Amino acid sequence: MKQLYWNICGEGDCDLVLLHGWGLNAGVWHCIIDRLTPHFRLHLVDLPGYGRSTEFGAMSLSEMAEIVLQQAPQQAIWLGWSMGGLVASQIALSHPERVRGLITVSSSPCFTAHDEWPGIRPEVLAGFQQQLSEDFQRTVERFLALQTLGTESARQDARLLKAVVLQHQMPEVAVLTGGLDILRTADLREELADCSLPFLRIYGYLDGLVPRKVAALLNSQWPHTQSVVMPGSAHAPFVSHPEAFSQLVVDFAQQSNT
């Protein structure tokens, strides 16, 4: 049976699963691990087809969620960044009994722009898919650079993300294309409106992929959820502002436990 790569660490009583974004792997969390391990038992996974979980091919959002659940703790707080936020949200919808709380980071229930809904223009995602087949390493690097654009530490943060990707074998083009398909087609807005779990949404003020307008729109549509827009950060707030980010996660876990 194929197995995902998992790394479990930490001294806390509360299980926290961290799901990375498109093109990356669990190494992306290294700048917050030391801040979180005193409070949590961390479960760091390479999503199917990424990092050290290379035996898997492209798959749908629901398929990815089911595979991740197979080796996950029975109940945990789930934190998903970017595409990982969609996976965590899908798990909260399909298996709410496994979820103590949901945190999405620089994520959107619908990444693609529609009428009166801010997001990535469909032609931009289509362009990335086309470029993947021509020069996939350069395309991944361009996508990573977009994630840190505008922050004071943009170049340093982009180098860090690139180093995380290059730590391991690059994902197959089919896996990367499948991930972009998820970003292009997923729309969980209506389903998540009925989610009654403790739910925190974290955004970066300077994020060029998930506009901060999404936070305000969902505040009115999902009044049962909390949101924080982190000033000075872009698409990877845990990289640019690890201390403030980690504190948000710890505070949310404590609230969810009361």
From Swiss-Prot:
<dbReference type="InterPro" id="IPR010076">
    <property type="entry name" value="BioH"/>
</dbReference>
<dbReference type="Pfam" id="PF00561">
    <property type="entry name" value="Abhydrolase_1"/>
</dbReference>
<feature type="binding site">
    <location>
        <position position="235"/>
    </location>
    <ligand>
        <name>substrate</name>
    </ligand>
</feature>
<dbReference type="InterPro" id="IPR050228">
    <property type="entry name" value="Carboxylesterase_BioH"/>
</dbReference>
<dbReference type="InterPro" id="IPR000073">
    <property type="entry name" value="AB_hydrolase_1"/>
</dbReference>
<feature type="binding site">
    <location>
        <begin position="143"/>
        <end position="147"/>
    </location>
    <ligand>
        <name>substrate</name>
    </ligand>
</feature>
<feature type="binding site">
    <location>
        <position position="22"/>
    </location>
    <ligand>
        <name>substrate</name>
    </ligand>
</feature>
<keyword id="KW-0378">Hydrolase</keyword>
<dbReference type="GO" id="GO:0005737">
    <property type="term" value="C:cytoplasm"/>
</dbReference>
<feature type="binding site">
    <location>
        <begin position="82"/>
        <end position="83"/>
    </location>
    <ligand>
        <name>substrate</name>
    </ligand>
</feature>
<comment type="similarity">
    <text>Belongs to the AB hydrolase superfamily. Carboxylesterase BioH family.</text>
</comment>
<comment type="pathway">
    <text>Cofactor biosynthesis; biotin biosynthesis.</text>
</comment>
<keyword id="KW-0963">Cytoplasm</keyword>
<feature type="domain" description="AB hydrolase-1">
    <location>
        <begin position="16"/>
        <end position="241"/>
    </location>
</feature>
<feature type="active site">
    <location>
        <position position="235"/>
    </location>
</feature>
<dbReference type="GO" id="GO:0009102">
    <property type="term" value="P:biotin biosynthetic process"/>
</dbReference>
<dbReference type="GO" id="GO:0090499">
    <property type="term" value="F:pimelyl-[acyl-carrier protein] methyl ester esterase activity"/>
</dbReference>
<keyword id="KW-0719">Serine esterase</keyword>
<comment type="function">
    <text>The physiological role of BioH is to remove the methyl group introduced by BioC when the pimeloyl moiety is complete. It allows to synthesize pimeloyl-ACP via the fatty acid synthetic pathway through the hydrolysis of the ester bonds of pimeloyl-ACP esters.</text>
</comment>
<dbReference type="InterPro" id="IPR029058">
    <property type="entry name" value="AB_hydrolase_fold"/>
</dbReference>
<feature type="active site" description="Nucleophile">
    <location>
        <position position="82"/>
    </location>
</feature>
<protein>
    <recommendedName>
        <fullName>Pimeloyl-[acyl-carrier protein] methyl ester esterase</fullName>
        <ecNumber>3.1.1.85</ecNumber>
    </recommendedName>
</protein>
<feature type="active site">
    <location>
        <position position="207"/>
    </location>
</feature>
<comment type="subunit">
    <text>Monomer.</text>
</comment>
<keyword id="KW-0093">Biotin biosynthesis</keyword>
